[in-house]
Amino acid sequence: MPTAPSRPFVRCKKTVLLVGEGPCEWAFLKHLVGLMQTRSGAFAAHVENAHGGSPDIVLHSTKKLLAQRAYNVCVVLMDTDRPWPTSLARNIGKTRMVYVRATPCLEGLLLQIIAHKRSSKNTTTDACKRLVYDAYVVERHRTEPAAYAKHFPIELLLKSRERCPALDEILRELQ
């Protein structure tokens, strides 16, 4: 009697949901995923935009996204220019949550990655935005992932992991 053909081995990928506070965070996260993801890679990533607002609104949007599909990990990138809730869920359902602080904003994180000489953790949000949009990212294209390609190549991002813990947290989940 012939035996049934064996079923092919299917490896399950780690699924990652990345949520950006607004359209600029979405574009930067989309740029990172584009650099790190391959078709046969170890993870499948989906990037969403929470459409701005307070951290509470961003977390509410994230919970709604997690109710639609199952993910292994959810990375939420938010600015610190507004106060965060005092307690953050470590898990939502079966999804592990990772909260990444862009201090004071995404543009501040970008300046940390580049190691810009005139920026520090005490630089204001407006000053960070002015520095980034004057020198690195064309302001009218800041919501497009391709706008980050020239000044934020994979080599720089990997080299910046040690001095930029927020970037390291994101990249760790994309491996």
Each model region followed by its residue ranges:
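C-terminal accessory helical subdomains adjacent to catalytic cores in phosphodiester-
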Residues: 1-15, 26-49, 56-175
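Short hydrophobic beta-strand that contains or immediately precedes a catalytic carboxylate
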Residues: 17-21
